[in-house]
Amino acid sequence: MRDKIRLNSSAGTGHFYTTDKNKKTMPEKFEIKKFDPVVRKHVMYKEGKIK
């Protein structure tokens, strides 16, 4: 089952992306480097819950 997740910026800007992931094949927390338009740099985004 694919669950929706929120990718929060580690730069502390409050910017986020939403995506989904398969929890059976990826049980660990998701981390990826993406572009943060607020600071205009590539930063790490970490998985968080959608409220």
From Swiss-Prot:
InterPro entries from the UniProt entry: Ribosomal_bL33, Ribosomal_bL33_CS, Ribosomal_bL33_sf, Ribosomal_zn-bd
GO CC annotation: cytosolic large ribosomal subunit
Keywords: Ribonucleoprotein, Ribosomal protein
Entry annotated with the keyword Ribonucleoprotein: yes
Upper classification of the organism: Bacteria, Pseudomonadati, Pseudomonadota, Gammaproteobacteria, Alteromonadales
Region (Disordered): 1-20
GO biological process: translation
A GO MF label: structural constituent of ribosome
Family, similarity comment: Belongs to the bacterial ribosomal protein bL33 family.
A Pfam family assignment: Ribosomal_L33
UniProt keyword annotation of Ribonucleoprotein present: yes
Name by which UniProt lists this protein: Large ribosomal subunit protein bL33
PANTHER family: 54S RIBOSOMAL PROTEIN L39, MITOCHONDRIAL, LARGE RIBOSOMAL SUBUNIT PROTEIN BL33M
